[in-house]
C-alpha cells in the first residue's frame, strides 16, 4: 500500500516495503531503477542492543551489518556491511537539529531472522555485534536497501525508533508503536532534498 502526495509543497510517496531484505530489495530496486526514485528513507522499529539506545529513541544508521548474502548474490559485494548515502544522512541530521530531535548514530544489524533460537554461547551473537561491530540495534531491511542504492547510484538512509531492548525488559505496546513513533517521521519529512 502506498500514498503519493505533497508535504509542505514537496512531492512525497509513503509506502510499506514488507518485512525483510528480499521484500525491500524488490521494492527499492524497482523504485530506483524503473520509477526514477532518487531517495528512499526507511523508517521503522528496532530492538536495542545497548543501554544507550532506550525506548522511543531515534537511531540514524551509519552502516548496516548483516550475515545475509543479499549483496553478494545481487551484485557480487562480499562485504558484510553496506552504507547509507552520506549526503542524505547529512540532510537528516540537519532536519533533526532544526527540530530539536536527538539522533543516536551508529551501525545497525540487519538480520534475516526475527526469532533467533537461544544459545548458551557467551558472549551472545548480539553482544558480539554490539561489541565488535558497534551495532546499536537490530532491524531486518536496511542492508539490502543500502546495497541497492549503491549499485544503482541512488540515495538511501534509515531512521529507526527503539521499540524493545535486549538489555532491558522494557517493551513498547502496539498502541505506542502506532501513535508515538513520530520523531523519525518528522526528521524524514523535514529533510530538504
Give each language-model segment a name:
Residues 1-91:
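Metabolite-binding pocket within alpha/beta catalytic cores that recognizes anionic/polar moieties
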Residues 43-47, 152-167:
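Glycine-rich phosphate/pyrophosphate-binding loops
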Residues 47, 109-115, 144, 162-165:
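Glycine-rich beta-alpha junction loops
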Residues 79-132:
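Active-site rim beta-loop-alpha module in soluble metabolic enzymes
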Residues 91-99, 148, 187-193:
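Generic non-transmembrane alpha-helical segments
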Residues 124-155:
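A C-terminal functional module that forms or caps the active site or interfaces directly
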Residues 166-193:
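His/Asp/Glu-rich mid-to-C-terminal helical/loop segments that flank catalytic regions of hydrolases
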Amino acid at each position: 500500500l502506498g500514498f503519493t502526495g505533497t508535504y509542505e509543497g514537496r512531492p512525497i510517496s509513503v509506502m510499506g516495503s514488507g518485512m525483510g531484505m528480499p521484500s525491500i530489495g524488490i521494492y527499492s530496486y524497482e523504485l530506483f531503477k524503473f520509477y526514477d526514485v532518487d531517495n528512499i528513507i526507511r523508517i521503522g522499529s528496532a530492538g536495542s542492543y545497548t543501554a544507550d539506545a532506550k525506548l522511543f529513541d531515534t537511531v540514524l544508521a551509519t552502516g548496516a551489518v548483516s550475515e545475509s548474502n543479499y549483496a553478494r548474490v545481487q551484485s557480487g559485494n562480499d562485504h558484510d556491511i553496506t552504507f547509507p548515502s552520506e549526503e542524505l544522512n547529512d540532510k537528516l541530521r540537519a532536519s533533526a537539529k532544526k527540530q530539536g530531535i536527538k539522533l543516536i548514530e551508529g551501525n545497525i544489524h540487519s538480520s534475516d531472522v526475527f526469532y533467533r533460537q537461544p544459545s548458551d554461547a557467551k558472549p551472545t551473537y548480539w553482544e558480539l555485534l554490539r561489541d565488535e561491530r558497534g551495532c546499536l540495534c537490530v532491524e531486518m531491511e536496511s542492508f539490502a536497501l543500502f546495497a541497492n542504492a549503491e549499485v544503482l547510484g541512488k540515495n538511501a538512509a534509515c531512521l529507526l525508533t527503539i521499540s524493545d531492548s535486549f538489555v532491558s525488559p522494557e517493551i513498547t505496546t502496539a498502541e505506542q508503536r502506532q501513535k508515538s513513533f513520530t520523531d523519525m517521521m518528522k526528521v524524514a519529512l523535514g529533510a530538504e532534498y
